[in-house]
Amino acid sequence: MLGFLKNFLDDNAREVKKLQRVVTAVNELEPRIEKLTDAELQAKTPALRERLEAGAPLDDLLPEAFAVVREVSRRVLDMRHFDVQIMGGVVLHQGKIAEMKTGEGKTLVATLPAYLNALTGRGVHIVTVNDYLAKRDSEWMGHIYRFLGLSTGLIVHGLDARQRQASYAADVIYGTNNEFGFDYLRDNMAMYPRDLVQRDLYYAIVDEVDSILIDEARTPLIISGQSGKPTDTYYTMARLVPKLKAETHFAVDEKARTVSLTEEGFARCEELLNIDNLSDPEHEEVLHHLNQALKAHALMKRDRDYVVKDGQVIIVDEFTGRLMFGRRYSDGLHQAIEAKEGVKIERESQTLATITFQNYFRMYEKLAGMTGTADTEAEEFKKIYGLDVVVVPTHKPMIREDLPDAVFKTEEGKFRAVVEEIAARHATGQPVLVGTISIEKSEVLSRMLTRRGIPHQVLNAKYHEKEAEIVAQAGRIGAVTIATNMAGRGTDIMLGGNPSFLALQEMRRRDYPPEVIAEAAEYGPCTEEVAEARRVYRELYAEFKKETDAEHDRVVALGGLFIIGTERHEARRIDNQLRGRCGRQGDPGATQFFVALNDDLLRLFGGDNIAGLMDRLKMDEDAPLEHPLISKSLETAQRRVENRNFSIRKHVLNYDDVINQQRELIYRQRRQVLCGEDLRPVVRQMMEEVAGQAVTAFAPEGVYPEEWNYEGLSEYMTQILPGEKWTVEDLEERLGKKRDDFRREDLRRLFLNEMEQAYAAREAELGAETMREIERVLMLRIVDEKWMDHLDAMDQLREGVGLRAYGQKDPLVEYKFESFDMFQNMIASIQEETVKKLFRVRVVPPQQAERRQVKENLYAAGGDGVKQPVRRDKKVGRNSPCPCGSGKKYKKCCAAKDEQAAG
């Protein structure tokens, strides 16, 4: 690992030198480009496209294209790309990951490679983490693209198929990772070619790439339908589990996040449930419910893993601390938590289509990403995605000071020291941001600060609605902010305050309508009322800018923002994200982590050395400890967890790659059926396969004809073919010979001829046009149904295959063999079902309204999750946080537009 790190640093320095040469080439063009008129600048797009069509590679067009975008940005947005932003743009164009620190202007960087690659006409996808950022960036950066004659699209929640098609047809498309993934799945469930929305997956630029490709790597997007399973058993198990004793009846492994019944526990549960043998296959479902109830009670903690809000169990994102509205744990775990908390249980769902972010984004021809923290995961990006990480230098030197960890014997002593440190800094007026890893810890600290009389703000999943407001104020004089996991918070902390936010706050005070305020700081087309609001906003912004600039200088004199981490996260990257909240754009700042020897990280992964050290040290709880062993143990523990998590993700990917290959094959064949004009050759091939498989099953090669199963073949032909029942005598009559003289080829040809005659008769009865439509719809429905069943079967295989290790077999190899057999059986089942139903299907007049409703329902559906959760979109409450991610209440954000669209 250390060798990899050294090589990475050396390679990065060499890479930056190469990038500097490209920056020089762009800068040399700047004086000439600056002299161009607007019309001459706009003429650059068709000129560059002509060069591209003439065979010039994109790399040759890069210097001029980048210089053009830089100049247009300066004219329309008054923002000129810095040299380091040009570097970042080159890295993204090369299909790599650009690590750029917070505040370095990643949004503007993306315009450079997006413009260059959009010249191909194939569409560039810019992927953000929520609807709010996608909408903001598409409108804001859209000025650059529109000036240059390119169109922009927006893919967010709530659009119908026609709106999505229009957006995907654009040159540059902004959207969220969830929506891009769901559209891929929905396209592969479409019943008509006109319902397809996505073009081919050409080039994606992923913002916060570490969050999407690592933190959510194991998160599948799932489109689901409700299953018919009853919910009573969950309540039964929720009442049973509290009667069990930890260690006596079940064992909890916090490190592996597992819980299992002991022998004594099995006996106790059998007694309580009045079951003879809980391990018996007939009680498999009961045992599954029991295990999920144990997980819900012993592993899942309220206000850490989830919160209960408005009678619902809502997952808390372990990486960002945000509430994950609409996401649900799969496999019955969410229902088990609902039963534990005594809220209404929602039914389990059945998977209709699924894909992980890992596999979705690996389908792009070219993939690139941006983030503030990627270098610690460079090895994983390279091994799993084939993506190199380049650390781009900052525009101004980084002068933030990262202080050594303060280590305490106990958590209580640590929190007392944190409060003292906050009090001392607050007394001088220096703003302080405190990062905690759970809602529970943030509220403990908040109570301690309240007792000390220190005014402060709390930002955690419970106070999501105030998020933007709290973050915007965190850099002001005397501000104290407690935040659960600042990763991905999306709003810059500006020293002295954010003038844009203050201007909008003043407009709220003046009673401007919420929908007008929402548009005041935007850039898109608008009404006269909004145009007037934008004029007022600009005036207020200029006024507050003077105030915040003066306050900025005072905060700088105090040392900038001081950040306290109250616990080390499992991943160094998340710690670095917290640190990265200060020291933006050359501002001063300092960070320090306060750590206790009984924090989860050290307790679970620190090893026996820490336990022994705790016993040996007879020190005051409130005194910080400094010991080289502790610092080393911290780093070792984090590396150990990172390596473990990487291994888990790699292991999961090995299994997921198996089903991914099957998915690609089935979706490719499905698309051929969907878009095929004449499916007769496909049906003919299916009939040949059905005949061949039947003969193989009932008249196996190498077996004497007198031993063949003629009765079985006759019954099977009766199932497939319309009309009379087939008997062995019919076979003899049609072939003109006795059964002992049959050859396998005779039987195959007879069966195939009978199917072809039935097919021809069916087409003559219905007409060629109707027959083609029936073939297409029937095949698509059968493929979808069989694929759905196959996904369920693969899930069950994956759950049980690990036990093969006890038999000295490699579970992955066994999984590959069995899944291949299952896939072959599914294909055979699709062929058989299609042929059989084609001869029997009844034709009814098309129900246009129903068909349209099904399509609309599909676009309202969707899902993704944590580990394997399922999202099912529901009606959003007017006082709930807006699903777009803006942090505002739904009624004050997107409600009016949604109601207008619905009406």
From Swiss-Prot:
Family: Belongs to the SecA family.
Protein name: Protein translocase subunit SecA
Annotated cofactor note: May bind 1 zinc ion per subunit.
Principal location class: membrane
Function: Part of the Sec protein translocase complex. Interacts with the SecYEG preprotein conducting channel. Has a central role in coupling the hydrolysis of ATP to the transfer of proteins into and across the cell membrane, serving as an ATP-driven molecular motor driving the stepwise translocation of polypeptide chains across the membrane.
Gene Ontology MF terms: ATP binding; metal ion binding; protein-exporting ATPase activity
Cofactor field: Zn(2+)
Enzyme class label: translocase
Domain of life: Bacteria
Subunit annotation: Monomer and homodimer. Part of the essential Sec protein translocation apparatus which comprises SecA, SecYEG and auxiliary proteins SecDF. Other proteins may also be involved.
GO-annotated cellular components: cell envelope Sec protein transport complex; cytosol; plasma membrane
Cystines in this chain: none
This enzyme's EC code(s): 7.4.2.8
Binding site for ATP: Q85, G103, E104, G105, K106, T107, D492
Disordered: region residues: 863-890
GO BP: intracellular protein transmembrane transport; protein import; protein targeting; protein transport by the Sec complex
Species in which this protein is naturally found: Desulforudis audaxviator (strain MP104C)
Membrane topology according to the record: Peripheral membrane protein
Places the protein is found: Cell membrane; Cytoplasm
UniProt xrefs under SMART domains: SecA_DEAD, SecA_PP_bind
